[in-house]
């Protein structure tokens, strides 16, 4: 049963006034992605006075561009990283439990074209089950070729010997980020997007806060805080460099960025509730075909990238690789003309000492938390699945260096996120189109707003736009169509078509420029060049 709740307003003028009026925060977090938002939830839940500042929109960077999987990491098991797999499996269970409206179990099928592939991969996945223990989502199955085709109707049948089925999870990354932001706010944290942290403040050679700027008005704010956390993902080295300059010494970069390209095609390419896993591509990596929100995601790549663009573009060879590899395992070869949207995420992989950063498959997927002599706490690496454990490690470091008084961990293990049904019931599947069901317990509040019956496109009504403006921090058309609705990531052409109508509603709600033309230009980057 879904109960009605009263959402917390996110009126920007009130948020900024609160920022101006607060004398000192316990914790100032820079970065509104999965990691920063997770720290905000944990710290606020422990009773600390928290502010989080994001230069653009929450989850604008890496955290909205994942492969949408909540997973223990099958490939990490193959690398022998048992501790990472065990932690991730535990966190997978916690996430699925705390946000069942946004994260759910998903069955994967791995087709086998060699006789020994089924037992080889199956035994490894049985180990995966064993590591999961009671946290397992379902037992690994060895499949006949007929059963494999039943689960994957469009799989390439020529030479098919059988398959293996196992369980992991999937989620809506951007909406989970919003749920974290709203959960932190409900616990008393102050979160502001479009408010970049510009400069660190020092007293007696120790960090005492920062200066931030409201990107909409240009107004500067001095934010004093007992502890400052740098959770800016692939961009953490920019703040570390500023901190190092204050100390008068150079800093060695700790991030080796890698980009992952994802391509979205129509459901007809994989008309099933099961995901397809390609265990070994031409370059030895894993490739997924994942049903998600009425479409299918194909991905991903793992390409070193030395620039840090906010909107990175795929290399042509990456698109060729994904479509080509998918075509080897699907009965119909997807082409560029079939691409409905595409996106690139930058992974903040932790760079080992003396590594040139070129082999991103072997660079650490684990997270790193460190602090400087001035007291700047930096966290990077990791993945969405383990965001909660990362948050606990960040606060442990804040305690260790004496910036905050220690308080017991574990407060977020059984903390339902905003929108989660009290009984933990799953009311819809993640592979169906978006709709009011995506809001969980907020569905009634959305339906009560004007325009609940005015559908702009399948899965998006006028009331959802109003709800985003009033209760979900949305400031622009992009915020709405990329991260409150996921339409830009599902069908960039449709997103462009309805953008003017969305802009009109947002303008009515916010009374300001909502950057329609910027969004229309952006939609073109989410489609491959034709010809």
Describe each PLM feature range:
Residues 193-208:
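A conserved short coil-to-beta-strand element within the FAD-binding core of flavoproteins
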Residues 29-30, 223-233:
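Short hydrophobic core segments
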Residues 23-25, 217-227:
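Core beta-strand elements of the Rossmann-like FAD/NAD(P) dinucleotide-binding domain
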Residues 44-65:
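Glycine-rich FAD pyrophosphate-binding loop
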Residues 32-33, 55:
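Glycine-rich Rossmann-fold phosphate-binding loop(s) that bind the pyrophosphate
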Residues 15-18, 24, 28, 56, ...:
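C-terminal accessory subdomains/tails of enzymes that are appended
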Residues 59-86, 90:
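Glycine-rich active-site loop/strand segments that organize a redox cofactor
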Residues 1-27, 42-46:
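Extreme N-terminal leader/targeting segments of oxidoreductases
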């Amino acid at each position: 049963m879904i109960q009605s709740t009263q959402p917390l307003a996110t009126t920007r003028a009130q948020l900024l006034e609160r920022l101006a009026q607060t004398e000192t925060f316990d914790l100032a977090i820079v970065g509104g992605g999965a990691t920063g938002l997770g720290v905000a939830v944990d710290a606020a839940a422990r009773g600390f006075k928290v502010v989080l500042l994001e230069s653009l929109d929450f989850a604008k960077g890496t955290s909205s561009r994942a492969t949408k999987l909540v997973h223990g990491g099958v490939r990490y098991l193959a690398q022998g990283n048992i501790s990472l797999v065990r932690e991730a499996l535990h966190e997978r269970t916690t996430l699925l439990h705390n946000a069942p409206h946004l994260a759910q179990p998903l069955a994967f099928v791995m087709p086998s074209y060699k006789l020994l592939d089924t037992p080889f991969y199956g035994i490894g996945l049985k180990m995966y089950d064993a590591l999961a223990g009671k946290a397992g989502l379902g037992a690994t199955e060895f499949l006949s070729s007929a059963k494999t085709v039943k689960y994957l109707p469009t799989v390439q049948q020529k030479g098919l010997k059988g398959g293996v089925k196992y369980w992991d999870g999937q989620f809506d990354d951007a909406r989970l980020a919003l749920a974290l932001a709203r959960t932190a706010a409900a616990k008393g944290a102050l979160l502001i997007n479009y408010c970049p942290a510009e400069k660190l403040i020092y007293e007696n050679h120790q960090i005492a806060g920062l200066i931030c700027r409201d990107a909409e008005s240009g107004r500067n704010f001095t934010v004093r805080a007992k502890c400052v956390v740098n959770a800016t993902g692939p961009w953490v080295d920019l703040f570390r460099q500023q901190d190092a300059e204050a100390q008068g010494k150079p800093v060695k970069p700790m991030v080796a960025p890698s980009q992952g390209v994802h391509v979205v095609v129509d459901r007809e390419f994989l008309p099933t509730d099961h995901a397809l896993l390609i265990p070994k591509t031409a370059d030895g990596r894993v490739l997924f075909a994942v049903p998600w929100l009425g479409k299918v995601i194909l991905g991903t790549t793992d390409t070193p990238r030395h620039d840090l663009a906010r909107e990175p573009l795929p290399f042509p060879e990456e698109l060729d690789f994904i479509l080509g590899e998918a075509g080897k395992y699907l009965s119909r070869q997807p082409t560029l003309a079939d691409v409905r949207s595409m996106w690139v995420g930058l992974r903040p992989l932790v760079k080992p000492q003396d590594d040139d950063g070129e082999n991103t498959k072997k660079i650490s997927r684990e997270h790193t938390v460190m602090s400087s002599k001035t007291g700047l706490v930096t966290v990077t690496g990791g993945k969405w699945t383990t965001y909660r454990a990362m948050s606990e490690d960040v606060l442990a470091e804040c305690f260790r260096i004496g910036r905050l008084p220690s308080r017991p961990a574990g407060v977020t293990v059984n903390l339902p996120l905003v929108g989660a049904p009290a009984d933990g019931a799953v009311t819809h599947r993640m592979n169906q189109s978006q709709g009011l069901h995506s809001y969980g317990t907020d569905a009634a509040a959305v339906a009560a707003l004007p325009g609940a019956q005015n559908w702009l496109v399948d899965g998006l009504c006028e009331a959802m736009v109003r709800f985003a403006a009033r209760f979900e921090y949305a400031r622009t058309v992009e915020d709405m169509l990329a991260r409150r609705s996921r339409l830009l990531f599902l069908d960039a052409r449709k997103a462009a078509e309805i953008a003017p109508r969305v802009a009109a509603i947002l303008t009515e709600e916010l009374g300001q420029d909502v950057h329609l033309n910027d969004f229309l230009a952006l939609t073109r980057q989410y489609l491959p060049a034709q010809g």
